[in-house]
Amino acid sequence: MADNSTHPIMKILESFGLTDVILAFFLSMVVGLLLGALVYMILTWMSRRRASATITRIPVHQSRSTTRSSSPRSRLGYSRHSSGYDRRSNNSLASAAFSFHRQTSSSPIDYGDSTGRKSSFRASTFHPLLQCSQIAREAEEGAQGSLPRTPTLTTSPGAAGSTSTVSSMITPPRARNRPDSFWGNSNLRGFHAGQTPPPAYDSIIRAYQETTT
């Protein structure tokens, strides 16, 4: 005998109809999509609102209080930096003005030779070593000019030997000529020309051979 029993789910589906089931499925899908889109829009709006709230400006009274509390330090730092910059600029301007005044006020023969010729190298730039040597030369000339003069002794002709000895004792010693330094007044002269030259190489070899033998 054939089994005429059917499944209960099939009975339920047969009672609703196939077209009604398909329509209900699509309607539920559309409603779910609409609800999901609505929830997504609400969440994005809330997140943007929270982000914009963190970026918004501080109220006026709070900003004033914060600027008052932080202004002394910032102003102090700014004043320090500005004062340092002004000091540097003033120093550079003063040095430039001083050098320009020094170059324009110098006469053309201040650093010239003894004959009065103009030396372009000395008159163009500032040379403290040359000034020091010039000051020392002037001091030496002043010291020589301030020495007492030799008194003239009037004696008889018979005492010629005594007068010569007395005059030799009284006359001041001659001013020694200063050797030219390595750094000359106008150029590099090197060592003094009057220095003894080194011994010859042959004489050194001969002396060494004599000492060894």
From Swiss-Prot:
Residues 63-75, 146-168 have a biased composition (Low complexity). Belongs to the MYCT1 family. Its main location: nucleus. GO terms for cellular component: nucleoplasm. A motif (Bipartite nuclear localization signal) lies at residues 48-68. InterPro entries: Myc_target_1 (IPR029180). The keyword Transcription does not apply. Keywords: Nucleus. One of its GO terms (biological process) is embryonic hemopoiesis. It is found in: Nucleus. Residues 59-89, 139-201 are annotated as: Disordered. This is Myc target protein 1 homolog.
